[in-house]
């Protein structure tokens, strides 16, 4: 069981596998729960995980087969019950397990009469067959039968334009999707303000990996997808600071505040609260954390005081002086200061 603290909650977020079974060599099933989640979180997590499981998990497939002296994929080969197209479809169904990257070569070379199964494929050391009994072809006569194969690790559907290859090499529309199906359901429980949700997640795989392994890989892919956003604010701050360092404004912030004080003489500045200035939520929160609640509090601060506020940025400074000059003429404040 993995536990993770939930921000703003006294409970811990927990997940566990409540059911796991092997229905066949090519069908694994797993059922997981995640709880407690706040209202709406279960649907968010369920949708994201389902998409990641079905579309982002890598699988290994046979992507190409080469026959000798075969004019097209609809040809028949003497001494073989299946046509070339049927053999290609059987090769497409072979389930492989590996951690290889790039293209690898494999082959089949047998002598009939006999049945050819996945067990007859000669594979590189890093690849193994999940179900060795999967059928490929039936040799009805004592002939030599050889196929050169290409194996590749990828994700999703891989299709190629079909055309006759003079060298007898034919692409196979590979389906690199080890997760066969994903379902999720949500159960709500609790009363009043204590309501929370439980996410149930069901995963079926083709045997090349377990549902638990698939869930781990999908979660890791989602984390990698969101990692750049964790550094976006830091990178943006660095960019703004560098830009303003070399191109300072024509008038300093402190000079503008001094001019505002002179122009607004007689105005009860302690009666104007910063939430009346239409500041952005980010700038407003920075000022509130620094106990700046009124316009008088703000105008009493120097530029250096403001820049020492936690998370306060150069763009916040510019936004403040632009907002003050825009929204603080005498005639615009009469209604607000009439009390």
Curated annotation (Swiss-Prot):
NCBIfam families: rpoA
Keyword NADP tagged: no
Enzyme Commission (EC) number: 2.7.7.6
GO MF, one annotated term: DNA binding
Superkingdom assignment: Eukaryota
Main location: plastid
Keyword Chloroplast set for record: yes
Protein name: DNA-directed RNA polymerase subunit alpha
């Amino acid at each position: 069981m993995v536990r993770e603290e939930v921000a703003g909650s006294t409970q811990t977020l927990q997940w566990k596998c409540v059911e796991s079974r092997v229905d066949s060599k090519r069908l694994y099933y797993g059922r997981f729960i995640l709880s407690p989640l706040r209202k709406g979180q279960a649907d968010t997590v369920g949708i994201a995980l389902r998409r990641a499981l079905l579309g982002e998990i890598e699988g290994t497939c046979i992507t190409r087969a080469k026959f000798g002296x075969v004019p097209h994929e609809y040809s028949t080969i003497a001494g073989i019950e299946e046509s070339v197209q049927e053999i290609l479809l059987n090769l497409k169904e072979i389930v492989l397990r590996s951690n290889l990257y790039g293209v690898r070569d494999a082959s089949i070379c047998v002598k009939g009469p006999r049945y050819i199964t996945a067990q007859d494929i000669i594979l590189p050391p890093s690849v193994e067959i999940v179900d060795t009994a999967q059928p490929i072809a039936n040799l009805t006569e004592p002939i030599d039968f050889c196929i050169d194969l290409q194996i590749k690790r990828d994700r999703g559907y891989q299709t190629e334009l079909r055309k006759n290859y003079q060298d007898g090499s034919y692409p196979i529309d590979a389906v690199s999707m080890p997760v066969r199906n994903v379902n999720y359901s949500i159960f709500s429980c609790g009363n009043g303000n204590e309501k929370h949700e439980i996410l149930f997640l069901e995963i079926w795989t083709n045997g090349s990996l377990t549902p638990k392994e698939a869930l781990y890989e999908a979660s890791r892919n989602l984390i990698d997808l969101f990692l750049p956003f964790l550094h976006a604010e830091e990178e943006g701050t660095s960019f703004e600071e560098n830009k303003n360092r070399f191109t300072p404004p024509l008038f300093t912030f402190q000079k503008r505040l001094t001019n505002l004080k002179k122009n607004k003489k007689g105005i009860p500045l302690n009666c104007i609260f910063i939430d009346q200035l239409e500041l952005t939520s980010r700038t407003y929160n920075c000022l509130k954390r620094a106990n700046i609640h009124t316009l008088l509090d703000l105008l009493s601060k120097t530029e250096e005081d403001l820049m020492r506020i936690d998370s306060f940025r150069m763009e916040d400074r510019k936004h403040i002086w632009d907002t003050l000059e825009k929204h603080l003429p005498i005639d615009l404040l009469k209604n607000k200061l009439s009390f």
